[in-house]
Amino acid sequence: MPTLVDSIALVELGEALWRVTRPDGDVLGYVEAFSTPAGPKYRAKRMLALQRRFVPIGEFWVMNDAVDCFR
């Protein structure tokens, strides 16, 4: 079941990957967790459907900051 965060839905796809969608199901992108020597970080990637590719938005120390990129 998706988790709603201020009109954005997060669908957990795996231990370290979430799909970010609008409530109507339109996919905005993905957030992936990864390890660094300083601790876990979160990478936000916007999906460009017409170009069939992803564009990195940024890397963040807090998952909510990564999700905020899609608002």
Task: Please place each PLM-identified region on the residue numbering.
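Short aromatic-glycine-(Arg/Gly/Cys) micro-motifs in beta-strand/loop hairpins
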Residues: L28-R53
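Negatively charged, low-complexity tracts enriched in Asp/Glu with abundant Ser/Thr
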Residues: M1-P23, L50-I57
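A broad, structure-centric signal for solvent-exposed, well-ordered loop/edge residues
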Residues: L17, V27, A38, N64-V67
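A short, charged, amphipathic alpha-helix used as a generic interaction element across diverse proteins
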Residues: A49-R71
